[in-house]
């Protein structure tokens, strides 16, 4: 057993003799002071802690919280009641009276005795749950635990194995029977009830456990059903980040398990830099310091620097794959190249096993905000009920803080920008909240001032408050950011002309679009995911050097359920090995100007390649079963009677927000933005040979090989999702009913490609009028030479044309009236003459 083995190894290292213990007990305090400057050991603030047996070895360890914090006082008080003056056993268990035998002190390996990783979801009802019971209760319905959306996505890519249903999760879980068990306000609960009625396949009642991957003795089944490889792919690659495992131990991926995944700091290098001399400083996989990070009140000291909040890099430990929102937020774009070279002349060090180029950072990141400053407790911990996709579990929208040009955030109706419908939300003003939610009172409580802003779904935004007509965002890192709402900025005329036109002049933009459709400066776009799952086994494939296998992260999580492994701090040494080796490649990368489409909320959104697998599967005998195969979803799905190609273009919030929005032309004059793809590639479903050839393309040598094999069915580029007739040719999202590509009608409405021709087909001399004006402008020096001058000219032409047409329209009734008056005056004398003659 892993824990017992570690205990034996550490016992030999740390307990070579009882005399050694006496030396350690006398010298640890001075030693720790030199090893961890700035991070105070517990004994400094609680001298009585020295009486705990734990301190005989761990005297230099940092305070888990600030000594004056309510949490630290509660820990120490409870520790005294339990007979531990240092309070260690409150979270870790063990025997604080034992000072000679580590095995006894650590209480063995069973979860009922000792918790080396107190945050682990497998035992945290006994640790974190003592004070944070509601958070512990809801962790099992968190999307970070179930990963149901990710699982459904891979199943979709392998031929829509479950259709739109989010059937499977890492672990079996179901909703509470009482609707009032959902954490949040009554308004929020009612709102979520309505969403469940709209999207029952996403807001599900229960998840079944993910099916097992093929065992070594089952590989013969692949030839009959290659889709079984999907479960190997999911379990080896996709699920290593979920909440119930410590995950991959690579640079950038080091983290805790369960609550500790977020609330314990780990550096990218994974080394411990605190004051506990018993922790090996040469080994990776350790926390940076033994202190909890969380809200503004939770101060963490590392060497001589004190910070608060959860750093973005903690979140990026997991959020560096898939939509890559974590690294994108930081301004990092994945690249296949290892440049620029490191200081020693070697390659750029791998981070999350990848390499990066520096891009523009999200403006919120630039302002010092972290993920938790926008994302609420319900977003990350769960509200206790299942939501099987990101868009389902996140309750916030841009307008919640920024409002619109004509309404403050508190004047907006609930559900604005979160409609899950094709029209904007309507209704009465949402107002503000006067108090926080009950289950978040242990965090930092900010002065409500004129009220806490409400999220789109009706919960208080507990760090964002109204102050008159302004908004204050209290960041976990300690900043109080005062922001002007859009309504204020428009009133003060502080919005650029482009912004005024886009947000104030074109109503449909805010009625139908996500703010980030324009304000995302870039999006990582990895076109074509070439997945190979190689099941070659040496006994079936004599020329193979080894039998290929990998680590099953879901099985590792379930192994934690076993009594002897509930308290394990990680998965090292686990035997959860399954056959198959997964490798991934891409066709090409882009970042600029993402295409647009419709998301599940019914709004225009950026799209990026989601899961676009071209699947290659190698059987146990080393022979290919599938090569470059793209599955199709079931007939009838995604607006296709035959079944759409399952290469998905996913609606995304890129987390690359900037004040400067993308240009009008980047949408209205772009085929890519409309979903028509990137021009320039040849058909991917053709084999491409590169060798000596004749002018009519006959290959001259007899001995040649294809440079690029054909990819079956892919008769268009990876970036195309719809054709010019509005026929969708690939899937666009696979979670929600409304996600799709633009229709033909929408394409025509959006596209302004070729607008230049409207003027220039008549210029300079195609008609007498334009020829005359062009020559006058040319010889008087008025021809526009810059974009600004051109815009001014077009503006003048538009105004002149408009006034001229208005004048004509106004002149017509005036002429009619004048003509009538003239006619009446003309015929009146005739009538008068007739009357005189008759007299």
Question: What are these model-derived regions, one by one?
Answer:
Residues 65-85, 102-121, 143-150, 254-260, ...:
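Gly/Gly-Pro-rich "capping" loops immediately C-terminal to redox-active cysteine motifs
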Residues 1-19:
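N-terminal secretory signal peptides that target proteins for export/translocation
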Residues 41-46, 60, 119-395, 400-512, ...:
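Extended surface/linker regions that mediate inter-domain or inter-protein docking
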Residues 39-68, 83-85, 140:
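Mature N-terminal segment immediately following signal peptide/propeptide cleavage
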Residues 772-804:
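Short, aromatic-rich amphipathic segments at membrane interfaces
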Residues 827-839:
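Cytoplasmic C-terminal tails of single-pass
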Residues 515-568:
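Long, well-ordered mid-to-C-terminal structural blocks that present hydrophobic/aromatic surfaces
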Residues 22-32:
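Bacterial N-terminal signal peptides
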């Amino acid at each position: 057993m892993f824990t017992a083995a570690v205990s034996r190894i550490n016992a030999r290292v740390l307990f070579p003799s009882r005399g050694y213990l006496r030396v350690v007990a006398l010298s640890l305090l001075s030693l720790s002071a030199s090893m961890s400057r700035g991070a105070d050991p517990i004994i400094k603030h609680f001298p009585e802690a020295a009486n705990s047996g734990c301190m005989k070895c761990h005297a230099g360890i940092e305070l888990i919280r600030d000594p004056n914090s309510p949490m630290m006082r509660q820990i120490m008080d409870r520790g005294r009641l339990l007979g531990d003056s240092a309070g260690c056993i409150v979270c870790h268990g063990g025997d604080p009276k034992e000072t000679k035998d580590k095995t006894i002190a650590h209480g063995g390996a069973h979860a009922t005795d000792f918790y080396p990783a107190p945050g682990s979801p497998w035992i945290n009802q006994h640790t974190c749950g003592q004070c944070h019971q509601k958070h512990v209760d809801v962790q099992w319905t968190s999307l970070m635990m179930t990963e149901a959306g990710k699982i459904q996505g891979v199943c979709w890519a392998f031929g829509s194995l479950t259709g739109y249903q989010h059937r499977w999760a890492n672990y079996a879980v179901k909703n509470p029977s009482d609707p009032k068990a959902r954490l949040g306000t009554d308004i929020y609960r009612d709102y979520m009830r309505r969403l469940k009625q709209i999207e029952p396949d996403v807001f599900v009642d229960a998840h079944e456990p993910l099916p097992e991957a093929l065992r070594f003795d089952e590989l013969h089944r692949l030839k009959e059903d290659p889709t079984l490889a999907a479960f190997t792919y999911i379990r080896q690659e996709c699920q290593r980040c979920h909440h119930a495992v410590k995950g991959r131990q690579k640079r950038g991926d080091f983290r805790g398990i369960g609550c500790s995944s977020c609330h314990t700091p780990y550096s990218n290098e994974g080394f411990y830099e605190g004051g506990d001399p018993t922790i090996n400083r040469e080994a990776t996989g350790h926390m940076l310091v033994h202190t909890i990070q969380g809200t503004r009140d939770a101060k963490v000291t590392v060497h001589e620097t004190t910070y608060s909040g959860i750093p973005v890099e903690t979140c990026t430990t997991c959020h560096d794959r898939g939509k890559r929102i974590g690294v994108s937020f930081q301004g990092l774009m994945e690249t296949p190249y290892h440049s620029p070279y490191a200081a020693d002349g070697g390659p750029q060090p791998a981070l999350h096993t990848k390499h990066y180029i520096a891009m523009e950072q999200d403006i919120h990141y630039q302002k010092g905000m972290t993920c938790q400053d926008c994302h609420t407790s319900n977003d990350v911990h769960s509200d206790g009920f299942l939501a099987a996709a990101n868009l389902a579990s996140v309750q916030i929208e841009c307008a919640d803080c920024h409002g619109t040009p004509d309404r403050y955030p508190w004047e907006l109706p609930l559900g604005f920008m979160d409609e899950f419908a094709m029209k904007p939300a309507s209704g009465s003003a949402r107002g503000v909240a006067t108090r926080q939610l009950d289950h978040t009172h242990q965090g930092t409580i900010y002065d409500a001032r004129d009220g806490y802003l409400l999220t789109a779904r009706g919960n208080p935004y507990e760090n964002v408050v109204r102050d008159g007509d302004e908004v204050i965002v209290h960041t976990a890192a300690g900043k109080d950011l005062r922001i002007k709402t859009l309504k204020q900025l428009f009133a003060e005329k502080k919005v650029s002309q482009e912004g005024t036109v886009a947000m104030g002049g074109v109503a449909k933009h805010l009625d139908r679009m996500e703010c980030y459709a324009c304000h995302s400066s870039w999006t990582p776009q990895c076109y074509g995911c070439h997945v190979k799952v190689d099941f070659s086994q040496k006994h079936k494939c004599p020329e193979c050097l080894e039998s290929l296998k990998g680590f099953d992260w879901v099985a590792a999580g379930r192994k934690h359920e076993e009594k002897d492994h509930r308290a394990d701090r990680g998965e090292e040494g686990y035997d959860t090995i399954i056959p198959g080796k997964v490798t991934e490649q891409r066709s090409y990368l882009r970042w600029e100007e993402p295409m647009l489409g419709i998301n599940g909320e019914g709004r225009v959104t950026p799209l990026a390649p989601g899961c676009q697998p071209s699947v290659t599967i190698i059987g146990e005998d080393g022979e290919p079963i599938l090569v470059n195969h793209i599955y199709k979803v079931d007939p009838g799905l995604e607006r296709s009677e035959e079944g759409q190609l399952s290469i998905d273009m996913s609606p995304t919030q890129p987390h690359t927000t900037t004040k400067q929005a993308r240009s009008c032309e980047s949408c209205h004059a772009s085929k890519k933005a409309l979903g028509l793809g990137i021009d320039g590639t040849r058909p991917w479903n053709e084999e491409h040979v590169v060798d000596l050839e004749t002018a009519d393309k006959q290959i001259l040598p007899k001995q040649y090989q294809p440079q690029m094999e054909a990819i079956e069915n892919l008769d268009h580029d990876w970036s195309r999702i719809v054709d010019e007739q509005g026929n969708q040719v690939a899937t666009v999202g696979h979670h929600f009913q409304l996600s799709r590509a633009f229709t033909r009608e929408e394409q025509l409405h959006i596209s302004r490609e070729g607008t230049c021709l409207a003027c220039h087909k008549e210029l300079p001399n195609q008609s007498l009028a334009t020829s005359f004006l062009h020559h006058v402008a040319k010889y008087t020096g008025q021809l526009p030479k810059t974009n600004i001058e051109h815009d001014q000219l077009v503006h003048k032409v538009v105004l002149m044309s408009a006034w001229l047409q208005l004048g004509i329209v106004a002149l017509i009734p005036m002429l009619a009236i004048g003509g009538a008056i003239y006619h009446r005056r003309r015929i009146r004398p005739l009538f008068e003459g007739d009357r005189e003659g008759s007299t």
